[in-house]
């Protein structure tokens, strides 16, 4: 993270020129962001939009905002926060500098992001599913308008991008980079009915706490990891595993020995690639010193002096000393989002941005799908998302997981089969197809 941001924010506060935010989506991530932004000088929340206006107002009140500050129409005082179900109205507010998109709905997110661009607003996008679908097209549109478009710091993709950037700036070769999660073979078939057992949670307690079964299903079945690693590949230029993520059961001590290429004794197909590691092994047993909530980068060197420094300065290395791992064992989601807001609002720089269309997250059947079955999309009963190189996905006519919801099968699809456009009746929304075609014209081919 860039040093000096807090001092600059304090100066903006003193000068009466705070970075003014409109938040679209007041769910878990948005609620965390609300709590923290209220504590930061130089950042001012001026609008919250959510289809559930009661949820938006509750999130603000729970964060300590007085009822008198909530404006359900036009602002009535200088410190009013507009609360609305109309995202477009919140985005259009003249004094908004940065829009935070946090709905979690990829198609809605694309619409909101493009509305923000049309209104001349910078955007921090929390809805990573939109970036996996059309991120490079969105970043290109922002650049053409002189605007900043950014991944959300606090989510794992932006934190991984930070580690990769650190490694490259300091002259290290990036061997692999990725995230931790909870996954083992068979978890890809997880449904909302089985998710709490797989996740290790009591179903009654999880439901009582209001946890979203579909969201947690997407975590457990591997879809969310595939989406996030697709975005990391797009933002960093790292390659995508041809067979999809391996979800290797690896603790932090084994990162440099396992997350290196096969020719060097590891388990990766090549150097310079994304991957995910699991906190449990194939039998469901816990991995020692797991990285379930964290992120990592493995760097390599052929320079014996650099390898010696890896050892002398306490890095975890493989037995050769040529590969070393650095990691962060947590991520604080919406509680860290103001890092992106400050970086975008003060410097006009993103905390990671999708650039190249090198990765795709495609839909794979979780069960046998009969003809005319409606696909329920990410985190549902019918499909999970698998990471693929973009050129492979297009050559096979694969349906992206972000466009799968609501489609109907035109023929029987067997469990484990890739869902292709020939398997369904529809072709997806016209505006999204246009954006995707613009990416295909600049597709990046994985080595």
Regions found by a protein language model. Give the residues of each.
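Short, ordered loop/turn segments at secondary-structure junctions
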Residues: 51-53, 104-105, 127-131, 154-155, ...
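Short gly/pro/ser/thr-enriched loop/turn and capping motifs at secondary-structure boundaries
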Residues: 54-55, 130-135, 139, 156-160, ...
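Rossmann-fold NAD(P)-binding glycine/threonine-rich loop
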Residues: 103, 107-119, 127-148, 152-155
